[in-house]
Amino acid sequence: MSKKNARWRKLDNAAKLYSAASNKKDTRVFRFYCELKEEVDSDVLQEALNQTIETFPTFLMVLRKGLFWHYLEPCNLRPIVKEEYKEPCSRLYIRDKKTLLFEVTYYKKRINFEVFHVLTDGTGATEFLKELIKNYLYLAHKEEGLEQVALLPEDMTVQDQEDDSFLKYYSKDQKRPKKRKLNTFQIRRKKKDGNHLHVHESVVSVQAVLKRSRELGVSMTIFLTALFMMAINEEMSKMQKKKPVVLMVPVNLRKFFPSTSMLNFFNWIEPGYNFTTQDQSFEAVLKYTKEFFETELTKEKMSAHISELLALELHPILRLAPLELKNLCIQAGAKYSEKNTTAIFSNMSAVKMPESYVPYIERFGVYTNTPKLELCLCSFQDKLSFAFTSRYDTVNIERNFYRLLKEQGITSEKVKPEFPKAGKPSELEMKVYKIYSFLCIAIVAAMLVTDLNFHPRIRWTLFTAGGVVTMWIASSIGFFKRYNLLKNAFRPMVSTSISGSSFRAL
């Protein structure tokens, strides 16, 4: 592969939306991981990552703010392998902070690759992780005779990797008929645990799903899309069923337009079904879904959608709008578009590795941070990994989904969640901290009011207020580092008491 240093570059169409719409809760980060059959060696993984970055220099970028758009700039930062230490799919991009937009971590037998969607899409992430796993296994087992193999074309260049395929296939003349957006059913459940992301995974047999799909005369994606809509329908009341269930289903555009780009290059379709006005049987939902996919998944319609998205971005007046104004408009548009879909279903398809590397790998998996309920899946060999992610206090829909699968003759096996304890305070700890903060503010306010009204000769009120503020700041810093309020409040309280005693002695 030709290795020419990457240069600064413009964001692709999807990346421009992600850079503006991401926030602390909706991080636009997704995780692709590989579970091995052996414990991960961090030193070997670091060496493998260093080699992988040589293959994909386009990933060594930081996000910068320009006058009109964000852009990516090469940097001298290098990724450091860490043991997993935080909630999956946590924020990677922090505004005005120079950080890489991806991270490689490990936990026991699992290697995680997390990436901000600005940098790449699912296909790009798959290629990066495959290269990383290949390099790791080669370094770990080359003494056993494992051979080094190339996964990418030898003649692939950096320019190929950073090619903006959206622009490449944009046509001014291509137009898509406008569709009226539906007022869709929205899942509304009380969120728990401080709005943390919840991940629930299961594994099924690829052959079992393919066998049943073929018996029904549909693809695996169509079969599972219909089941997902049925599972959601079972949780809807009679009133709620007046609104359609609409899924967002991402589509890899490389299947329609040749591209070796590592940038975002995907589209989506939105199959929707109204369970009040349409037949509620599975056969009817499956028939509708099949017809919808056949109608929408055409090169002409994908091309028209690309042109529609690019036409807005390239509008001469909108291009001149300052970045901050664009960000506000994109954020408002993203918030509005959330109402157009009920949930998200993303099929990352099969991950293939060289035959000699297969015995060392258990499975691959993928999931993403999302404000909605999302089902992601990918397969390796005969293991199809499902991952439901949400921030809702319910697992009923996924329970329904797996029950419906079982009714189709497909059994699933739950994956026991294995995550290190997240470095975040619990809901109870946050409540205690908020009460503590309120009391500190109340004391400071009382001291200031007392000082203003009584004007004591010795300004003990101001010293007390200052001591409380100091104690609160020190306690807060310690709390968000260690999440133990009593332990972190003790030292400031002692310091404040000593200071107060010294002052009185004077």
Predicted feature residues:
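Acyl-thioester-dependent acyl-group transfer interface
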Residues: M1-L67, N76-E103, E234-G423
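Acyl activation and transfer enzymes in specialized metabolism, enriched
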Residues: K37-E54, E114-K130, V199-K238, F386-F388, ...
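Juxtamembrane interface helix immediately N-terminal to a transmembrane segment
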Residues: K424-C440
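Canonical alpha-helical transmembrane segments of integral membrane proteins
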Residues: I435-L448, G467-V468
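Juxtamembrane "helix-exit" motif on the non-cytosolic side of transmembrane helices
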Residues: M447-P456
